[in-house]
């Protein structure tokens, strides 16, 4: 569980600190995704189970918290897998 909490913090840090010119996925959330983060995870990564990454990037603290339409800065799938390996999540 500690690794997942650290992953959440690292993803949020990535979202806040990644410069515009750096490699990342920039995704504008849509109205239909407000209460279903799996939609974004499926659209971005093709993997609905990556919804916690979306939650962390958006700065949400609870799955019950609605996602306002915004620009999300997300790691690429390769960056995400590397980060998960470094933290021992996979």
Per-range role (PLM):
Residues 1-90:
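Cell-surface/extracellular proteins and modules involved
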């Amino acid at each position: 569980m500690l690794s997942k909490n650290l992953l959440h913090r690292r993803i949020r840090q990535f979202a806040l600190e990644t410069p515009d010119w750096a490699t990342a996925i920039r995704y504008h959330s849509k109205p239909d995704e407000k209460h279903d983060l799996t939609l974004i995870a499926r659209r971005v990564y093709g993997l609905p189970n990556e919804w916690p990454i979306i939650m962390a990037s958006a700065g949400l603290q609870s799955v019950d918290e609605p996602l306002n339409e915004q620009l999300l800065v997300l790691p690429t799938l390769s960056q995400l897998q590397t980060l998960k390996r470094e933290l021992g999540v996979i």
